[in-house]
């Protein structure tokens, strides 16, 4: 696709990421600008295009159109932002369960196409106008066994696991924790440690299989399964979520 959007820098700023800057095009779409410099940024952007081409159309993947100026993507509400703005208690359990199932469905599809997302989390899932969730941000993902250029958040990565299906599943467990509680795992450490120390401490805890308590959570068994290596595929995760 080579059409160009009606767009100017005067449009609303949405976000700035590692690779690109995102602006609103209209009420339904955003544009993720093509990076103009930086080898890493260019490589990650090219991988994102390849990922969207590989994934094609799927109801759990935000639709993408490639233009000269950037990627035109569906505009939704960031799941993390929604949890923080309305509060997790304001979202009914039935809706959280639906989103968990849909996210598992989306990640299963991503894996079936030979793609490892490599940054699974509530920050990379949007809620659309119909209250369904979709995955976004494949900049730097891994395709067909290639090493990803990106990695997970500090609260979603276990050292030594390697980047692949199992690491995506581990991060999915942290995503479920945040979906239910409104906070990332070990969020209470964020205010007392700088980022370098925070990463080191949490990675050490995860390496020793010391995870936040989940016994009182509805997703407890699935979260624990993701963190403890119970699952070999996200389809198994989806199956157990469906039993809740």
Stretches found by the model and what they are:
Residues 103-110, 176:
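Conserved hydrophobic alpha-helix
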Residues 107, 111-128:
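Catalytic-loop of the protein kinase fold
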Residues 5-57:
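ATP-binding glycine-rich loop module of kinase domains
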Residues 132-134, 139-236, 240:
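C-lobe/activation-segment region of protein kinase-like
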Residues 24, 33, 73-75, 127:
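Conserved hydrophobic "DFG−1" position in protein kinase catalytic cores
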Residues 56-99:
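Conserved structural core of kinase catalytic domains
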Residues 29, 60, 71, 134-137:
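Protein kinase-like catalytic core scaffold
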Residues 52, 104-107, 223:
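Hydrophobic core positions within the conserved protein kinase catalytic domain
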């Amino acid at each position: 696709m080579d059409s160009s959007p009606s767009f100017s820098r005067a449009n609303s700023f949405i976000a700035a990421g590692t690779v690109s800057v995102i602006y609103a095009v209209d009420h339904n779409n955003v544009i993720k600008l093509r990076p103009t410099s930086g080898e890493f940024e260019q490589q990650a952007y090219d991988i994102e295009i390849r990922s969207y081409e590989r994934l094609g159309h799927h109801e759990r993947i935000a639709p993408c159109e490639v233009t000269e100026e950037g990627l035109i993507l569906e505009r939704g509400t960031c799941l993390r932002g929604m949890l923080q703005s309305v509060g997790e208690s304001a979202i009914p359990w039935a809706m959280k369960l639906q989103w968990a199932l849909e996210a598992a469905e989306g990640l299963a599809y991503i894996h079936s196409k030979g793609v490892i997302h490599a940054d699974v989390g509530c920050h990379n899932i949007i809620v659309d106008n119909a209250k369904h969730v979709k995955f976004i941000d494949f900049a730097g993902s891994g395709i067909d066994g290639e090493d990803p250029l990106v990695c997970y958040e500090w609260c979603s990565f276990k050292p030594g696991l390697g980047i692949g299906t199992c690491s995506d599943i581990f991060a999915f467990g942290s995503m479920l924790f945040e979906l239910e509680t409104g906070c990332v795992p070990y969020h209470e450490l964020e205010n007392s440690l700088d980022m370098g120390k925070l990463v080191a401490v949490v990675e050490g805890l995860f390496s020793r299989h010391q995870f936040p308590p989940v016994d009182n959570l509805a997703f407890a068994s699935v979260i624990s399964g993701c963190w403890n290596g119970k699952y070999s595929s996200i389809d198994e995760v989806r199956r157990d979520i469906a039993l809740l």
